[in-house]
Regions:
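Positively charged n-region of N-terminal signal peptides that target proteins for export
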Residues: 1-4
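Bacterial N-terminal signal peptides
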Residues: 8-16
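Ligand-binding loop in jelly-roll beta-barrel domains
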Residues: 125-153
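A short beta-strand-loop-beta hairpin characteristic of the jelly-roll/cupin
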Residues: 80, 90-117, 127
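Conserved metal-binding segment of the jelly-roll/cupin
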Residues: 75-78, 115-136
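Ligand-binding pocket scaffold of soluble enzyme catalytic domains
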Residues: 77-79, 86-89, 103-107, 130, ...
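A short, N-terminal "cap"/entry segment at the start of jelly-roll beta-barrel domains
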Residues: 22-71, 82, 152-168
Length: 168
């Protein structure tokens, strides 16, 4: 009888430990998603001017409006922009310098590419693409506009939820 009781207590103890560990991991992931995210450049203000072209919350801090336009763009976990194209009659395009977190970049018809701090993405004018944060990570990059003639952006459809959720 004592052995049965001891085994029952051991089983209950193991179950409680597993439940506690699972809860602790969940809490750790939640804290990571909501923790303060800092990079070299200030996050900036909520990107309300372009909010209709994003799923989730992004922030924009314009670092330079002279010579070459440079903005620090920060994405909350799960935030991404719609497919879009940077058009130009000559030159144009964009360069991304990843400064923090984990995100993705994808060109139309190609596989998504994971982005980590230090990665550089050269986006020629006329290429349909999107970028954004991983579901469980903040993401930040510098967006450098390549000078060109008659530059303009064309905003397209959001990234399909099924496609985004399939990313690791």
């Amino acid at each position: 009888m004592k052995k049965v009781f001891a085994l029952m207590m051991l089983a209950i103890s193991l179950l409680m430990s597993s439940a506690y560990a699972a809860e602790e991991n969940t809490n750790k992931e939640e804290k990571q998603m909501h923790q303060e995210f800092t990079t070299v450049f200030a996050r900036g203000a909520k990107n309300d001017a372009y909010a209709k072209y994003f799923v989730g919350q992004s922030y924009l801090n314009m670092l330079s409006l002279e010579q070459v336009v440079i903005g620090n763009v920060t994405f909350e976990p799960g935030c991404r922009n719609n497919w879009h194209i940077h058009h130009a009659d000559k030159g144009g395009g964009q360069i991304l310098l990843v400064t923090g977190g984990r995100g993705y970049y994808q060109e139309w018809g190609k596989e998504a590419r994971e982005l980590l701090p230090g990665d550089v993405v050269n986006i020629p004018a006329g290429v349909k693409h999107w970028r954004g944060a991983a579901p469980n990570s903040w993401f930040a990059h510098l967006a450098i506009e390549v000078p060109g003639e008659n530059t303009r952006n064309e905003w397209c459809e959001p990234v399909a939820e099924k496609e985004y959720n399939a990313l690791k």
